[in-house]
Amino acid sequence: MTALPSKNCSFQYQSHQAPRSLDATCLLLLIILGKVLLNVLILRVKRKDTSWSFMEYFCFSLALVDLLLLVNISVLTYFRDFVVLGIRFTNYHICLLTQIVSFAYGFLHYPVCSLACIDYWCNLSRATKPSSRWQKLLYLLTVILTWISVLAYVLGDPAISASLKTHKTSVNQCPSYVSTQSHWLSLSMLMILSVAFLISWQEVVALIQAIRIASYKNKAVLYFPFPPHTSYTVSPRAVLLPRLIVCFLGTWFPFVALQVLILSLRVQIPAYIEMNVPWLYFVNSFLIAAVYWFNCHKLYWRDGMFPVDPFINWKCCFVPVHRLKQVERPMSIIIC
């Protein structure tokens, strides 16, 4: 597959000539199949006791779109040249479908992250939660509207349409598109995380040395040493920041290292691969931590006030265990 330059400012491209002996279609099928299996794996291993949010709905919709993409490419590959309702489908449509999906995925990073951040911010500042049925319906409609909007933009943008028509006769070569949205989003997250770590690295080290893994209500949790509290209000930002960093890196450190490696080597990943469920859950955890830090003065130990992360139990950053009966004998102690 070959990546070609475009005038669209939201994308970057690189060119490379694939070996003629390599079947690009089979390679594309294997890539999409691997992505679908990875999406299914992440959706199965995530925590099941999570409350639904916009990001949860979008992750499931993305997994469904990837599955539909795999089915369509498989059908086009198997039949190769066939006619349906007077429309002739060939190998060219495999390339066309991949290009459209790549453009759509490439434009989704900023809107999805913005909507997820607004969702968590509103849920945190709201005293009472709305009806669960109406909230789920709102999430579903928002996800559908997001997909429709981005597809309408991709199909209606003159520059993208011109790029798609340029390669209409090309069968052996297919342009692959690389979104710059994910690049800048990843770079921004890593910079914020680095600054936060530099500001509170001493507290982070001290906290890691004091962390205990304890059994709390028949679940293994990280037990942070809390100073005496007279209420259930959370600690100030300076105290909360190292706890958030430890929780985030404790879960997503391999993914953070992968992002550093990708940015350092300037690896160009096609947009249809880069937009995936693990990446969205990684961004989701970062957004939740950021919302917690900015709104630490509003947080209380109440289940309804905490957006639930499918991979991180953020309550261990806030909940002081005052009654020793609630905490069983520590299973282990982590010492740096």
From Swiss-Prot:
Subcellular location per UniProt equals: Cell membrane
The way it spans or sits in the membrane comes to: Multi-pass membrane protein
Tell me where the transmembrane regions lie: 22-42, 57-77, 96-116, 137-157, 188-208, 244-264, 273-293
Chain's role: Orphan receptor.
Question: Which residues lie toward the Extracellular compartment?
Answer: 1-21, 78-95, 158-187, 265-272
UniProt keyword annotations, A-Z: Cell membrane, G-protein coupled receptor, Glycoprotein, Membrane, Receptor, Transducer, Transmembrane, Transmembrane helix
What spans does the record annotate as topological domain Cytoplasmic, numbered to this chain?
A: 43-56, 117-136, 209-243, 294-336
Gene3D superfamilies, per this entry?
Rhodopsin 7-helix transmembrane proteins
Domain of life of the organism encoding this protein: Eukaryota
Which residues carry attached sugars according to the database record?
N8
Protein name in UniProt: Probable G-protein coupled receptor 160
Query: Which InterPro entries does the UniProt entry name for this protein?
Result: GPCR_Rhodpsn_7TM, GPR160
Q: Name one GO molecular function term.
A: G protein-coupled receptor activity
Instruction: Give a GO cellular-component term.
Output: plasma membrane
User: What is the originating organism of this protein?
Assistant: Rattus norvegicus (Rat)
Q: Which family does it belong to?
A: Belongs to the G-protein coupled receptor 1 family.
Give the chief site where it resides.
Answer: membrane
> Keyword Thylakoid, does the record have it?
no
PROSITE patterns xrefs: G_PROTEIN_RECEP_F1_2
